[in-house]
Amino acid sequence: MSLLQFSGLFVVWLLCTLFIATLTWFEFRRVRFNFNVFFSLLFLLTFFFGFPLTSVLVFRFDVGVAPPEILLQALLSAGCFYAVYYVTYKTRLRKRTTDVPRRPLFTMNRVETNLTWVILMGIALVSVGIFFMHNGFLLFRLNSYSQIFSSEVSGVALKRFFYFFIPAMLVVYFLRQDSKAWLFFLVSTVAFGLLTYMIVGGTRANIIIAFAIFLFIGIIRGWISLWMLAAAGVLGIVGMFWLALKRYGMNVSGDEAFYTFLYLTRDTFSPWENLALLLQNYDNIDFQGLAPIVRDFYVFIPSWLWPGRPSMVLNSANYFTWEVLNNHSGLAISPTLIGSLVVMGGALFIPLGAIVVGLIIKWFDWLYELGNRETNRYKAAILHSFCFGAIFNMIVLAREGLDSFVSRVVFFIVVFGACLMIAKLLYWLFESAGLIHKRTKSSLRTQVEG
């Protein structure tokens, strides 16, 4: 890449970054937080944060990258995607009407809400316990990170339930919403994330997500400033780099450490070059249609229920890894959101995907606002826990693609909804057995006086 080519790319990168950052800033000033703000920051991180890192790798360490015209296509496709997404998100689908009282879809009380978070936490802890009994601490047993996907590790399906510890702790926080509950959320979820990091053998997702949710709650409540958020972001990048070194068993120093920091940080937070690699091989892609979305559900079907289930699932990430990169190391390489759309239907699917994503984020913001307006604090805690708990799925959406997002968000909704139903069933059984006694003002006054 020549200096002139880099200058052209830099101008395009700067314009796209300023465009998205400006719209995000105006939205932040208007509402302080919603899921449009979160997705916009996530989109910036995924598709634009990596460009400066790539530039340093090219000019400082002479690392080979895709041709400049392909990198330009990647930047422009990301910028155009966001423009279509933003217009879709801001488009009003129906006329604004005065709030008419409607019959609520469901209600929650204190016992049902507490039962819900206990069940969610129980699912996570039991899953971790069973996985640990089968495999022990994989971080200290395996020689390479790719081995966690091998036949040496049993009970891999249990890892999908670990994440429900975070929604459980979110319910606990939203029931109190004070600084002590906020700090308790951070300590409990990060501690759980570190435990799963050691047990699973290097998975950092629970730690990243817990820390991100903690920061956004702090921003919403005004407990941290933007400068503190930026400092925490830098600390998070350094922390993730250190965990990555431990995961891959690397011991580096000097220039090698700087080089390793650049490419690991780029691959962890901003795999935008993967989109460029897909575009570089555009003519060789056999468009998969909507099949990757259907195939991604295969991993949630037990083999005893479907004996002939394919052992290898050809979703967009695996198609990119196996067919485009010809990489059979055992790791699936993230194609990014736009990359997954390219795999499914080429350039035509990019604006269509942007419209779909705009509607998805719009739905989450509608649900979030519903929680903000809810007068029943227990129902509000459940709604907010569901919305913030889905942040993991939005990260999957930006990094892994639309197919991975759809299967995971459906799984999340099913498990979360099942926990709600079980909590309500248990409450009904306890109440029928006479074990539930409603609190009265007189009993509360007696407790206080006593």
Swiss-Prot record:
Keyword presence, Cell membrane: yes
Bilayer disposition of the protein: Multi-pass membrane protein
InterPro entries reported in the protein's UniProt record: WzyE
Pfam family, one: WzyE
Any one biological process term the GO annotation gives: enterobacterial common antigen biosynthetic process
Major localization listed first in the record, in broad terms: membrane
Cellular compartment(s): Cell inner membrane
Protein's pathway: Bacterial outer membrane biogenesis; enterobacterial common antigen biosynthesis
Domain of life: Bacteria
GO cellular component: plasma membrane
Protein keywords: Cell inner membrane, Cell membrane, Membrane, Transmembrane, Transmembrane helix
Transmembrane segments: 6-26, 37-57, 63-83, 118-138, 155-175, 181-201, 207-227, 228-248, 341-361, 378-398, 410-430
UniProt similarity note: Belongs to the WzyE family.
Self-association state and partner proteins as the record states: Probably part of a complex composed of WzxE, WzyE and WzzE.
Biological role: Probably involved in the polymerization of enterobacterial common antigen (ECA) trisaccharide repeat units.
Protein name, UniProt field: Probable ECA polymerase
